[in-house]
């Protein structure tokens, strides 16, 4: 007989700085209420995201009824990648009136390539359009 599947008791989604997870809020309270060993998660997450230090990396944590967990790291948010590529700290307060930066089509394609596994797109062109739309809504002009 095949082993029984563990019963899932919770799904937690967090956005944490890569390699910098610690038991302080927001990580501690979110995991604590599900009974997860917080330090164990922090060590595993920091080890998994060490190469991406300085970026915000979303993580999906699946908690099982025996209080064990698994987690999947995602690609950094598109907005963060766009801001980094454009070299600005934040988007425009009035995106359709005030433009804060410009991105080239090549930069948009590069970001789309990075984000492709997490986007709802079948090919690179569709992913590029999604990224370009996000950039426009932040007051960043896309050229090309």
UniProtKB/Swiss-Prot annotation:
Origin superkingdom: Bacteria
Entry-linked InterPro entries: Ribosomal_uL11, Ribosomal_uL11_bac-typ, Ribosomal_uL11_C, Ribosomal_uL11_C_sf, Ribosomal_uL11_CS, Ribosomal_uL11_N, Ribosomal_uL11_N_sf
GO biological process: response to antibiotic; translation
Membrane-traversing stretches: none
Keywords: Antibiotic resistance, Methylation, Ribonucleoprotein, Ribosomal protein, RNA-binding, rRNA-binding
SMART domains xrefs: RL11
Coiled coil: none
PTM info: One or more lysine residues are methylated.
GO cellular component: cytosolic large ribosomal subunit
GO molecular function, one term: structural constituent of ribosome
Family: Belongs to the universal ribosomal protein uL11 family.
HAMAP family assigned to the protein according to its UniProt record, in alphabetical order: Ribosomal_uL11 (MF_00736)
Protein name in UniProt: Large ribosomal subunit protein uL11
